[in-house]
C-alpha cells in the first residue's frame, strides 16, 4: 500500500490508508491509547481501544514521543477530535525507530497543579540537537515559507528572461578586501571562500547573458555576535544589463520582493500569524527612498539621535534600527531605500556620479539591512582607477579583464535569504538558518 500524506486523509473517510511520521504526543492508559502522528503536511490522531485491538498493546507500550511509526488503518469522522474532526482506527502499527528521551526542551511547558513549569532550552542548546528542534511546527513553517519566498522570486525572474547560474565558491581573490574572507589551502597556493558571487555575476554581463540570478552560500569571516549576523548564509543575487540608473535596480528589487511576499501571504500568511503572531505585509510600491544625510538629519530632529561627522558616510547600527521608526512615521512602510553613501564606504566597483557619489543603495526592512545594490562601473579605465584607490588593482587583475573587451552598463544586488526569513517570522538568525554558523559555532 502506498503512503498517504496526512493532509490528504480527509479525502479517504471510510477507507483504509497507510500513514507515516513522528509521534508528537502519546497518551497511553489502561483501556485507551491516543497517538498524535505528525508528518511534514499535518497531524492525525490515532485512536486505539485496547480491548478491540489486543494485538497492538505490546507495540504501543514500547512507543515513546518522537518515535517514528507506520500506521495502517481506517479513516473515520469524529466531531470530538480537535484535528479536523478526523481520526484513524489502526489495524497495524509498525515501529520504524524508537526515540530515546529527548536531550532538549523544544517548547516551554506551563506549570500545572501537579507539575512545575519547564523552561525551553536555550537556542544554543537546541542547535546542538538541531535535527530534533527542527521538528517543531514553528521551524517547519519557517522553512516552508522560505521555500515559497525563494521559489516565487525565482519564478518572477524566469518569467522576465533571467538565467539561473551557479558560480564558484572557491576564488583566487577576495571580492571586496581581504579582511572578511576565509583563507583555505588550495594545493600549492591560497584560495578564499567567496563572500559574494559579485565578480562572476559581472562576468556574466560581459559574456552577454544580460540577466542572471543565483542562489547559493555566502561566507563572511566577521566576528559578529548579533542576532542578525552569521559566517555562512544563503544569498539570492541578481545582475542585469542595459540599465540607465541604479533606480532601475531598485525598481526590480521592490517588484521582486513584492512578488515573493505576496506568494508567502497567500500560502502561509494565516499560519504565520497563528504561530508567530506576525502579519505578512505585502508592500506597496514604490518603496520610500531617502538620502543618507537626510535620514541622519531626520533621526536627529525626531529622535535626538546624533553621530560624529566622521561616521555619517555610512549607516550606523543604531541608525539602521531607528530607520524603521522613521519610515513607519513618514510612510507607514516596512521598507526603506537609503542612497548617497560615502565612496569610502562603498565597494570600488560601484559607479559614481560626477560628484563622486556612489550610484547605489542599501535596502532596510523593519530596521534591518537586507540588501546592498548598485549600478556597477563597467568602463575599464574608470574601474581600474577606483580599484587602485582602494589598493586592490593587483588582487583583482583577473576581474578587471572582464571589462577590457566590451561590457554593457549593468547593475544588481544581493539579498540575504536567512535575514528575509528571520524578519518574516520574527526570529533570530540562529532560528532562521537551517544550521547556523558563527564565530563560535561550527557543528553540527
Language-model segments: which ranges?
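Flexible helix-coil linker/hinge segments at domain or subdomain boundaries
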Residues: 259-273
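Class II aminoacyl-tRNA synthetase-like tRNA-binding/catalytic domains
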Residues: 2-243, 435
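Juxtamembrane/interface motifs at transmembrane-helix termini
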Residues: 109, 269-271, 419
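Serine/threonine-rich low-complexity intrinsically disordered regions
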Residues: 49, 53, 78, 121, ...
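A translation/RNA-centric and nucleic-acid-associated enzymatic feature enriched
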Residues: 180-262, 285-444
